[in-house]
Every structure is written in C-alpha cells, then in structure tokens.
Amino acid sequence: MYKIYTSYFSNKKLPEDIQKIPICSKILSPGNYATYYKELAPNASDVRDLYNQNITEVEFSLNYLNKLEHIREDRSLDLIVQDLELRLEYSDIVLLCYEKPNKFCHRHILAQFLKKNYDFQIEEF
C-alpha cells in the first residue's frame, strides 16, 4: 500500500507521480491536482484571525478540530477517507497547504486527527 504525506505547495522535492491534493481554502499555486478537499480547509475567518493575532494557535487548533469533528459527524469526512483509501491503491498522496514544515499549519493537526480517528499514518514530506 502507498503512503499519505503532508507538504507545502512550493516543495520542489515532491515526485511528479505523487497525487497532489490541496486542503486549503484557496489554491493560489497553479498545478495538476488529483482532486481538491476544500472541506478540510480551516475556516477563512480563523486563518485571518490567526494571521492578525486575534486568536492563538491553541484557539485556532480547537476551532479546526471542532470543524473536523463536525464534518466527521455529518459523514462527509467518511467520503474523503474512502476516496483517500481508493487513491492509495495507485500511488502515494500528498495533502498540500502553504506553510513550510517548521511553521504552524492545519495540515499537521489534520494528520494527527486522521491518525487518531482513521489509523492513517501520515508523514511530512
């Protein structure tokens, strides 16, 4: 079975054959993407508030985890998980956002959430 990774759009080390899937509210980087999981993006207001330092990283994380729980409860996250499982039959997957690996980013929260709730092993690429 193939693997799931997280990374950032401008990572030049990503292989050409990896399935690239954005998980942010806006895609500013042109590219050939396998699909787009906009549902996994944090709320735009939380991103703005974090950027403007109106909320802390802890508050952002709690808000994002609440969003993930909500989409898990309404079963839309199950559809994404099923799609990921199908895609893993063909090649590795990378879930993309903008922040560099050493910066705070929702993709790291998502990776932990998917590990805890769906037993996915996700690494930063």
Residue ranges and their predicted role:
Residues M1-F125:
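Residues lining hydrophobic/aromatic ligand-binding pockets adjacent to catalytic sites
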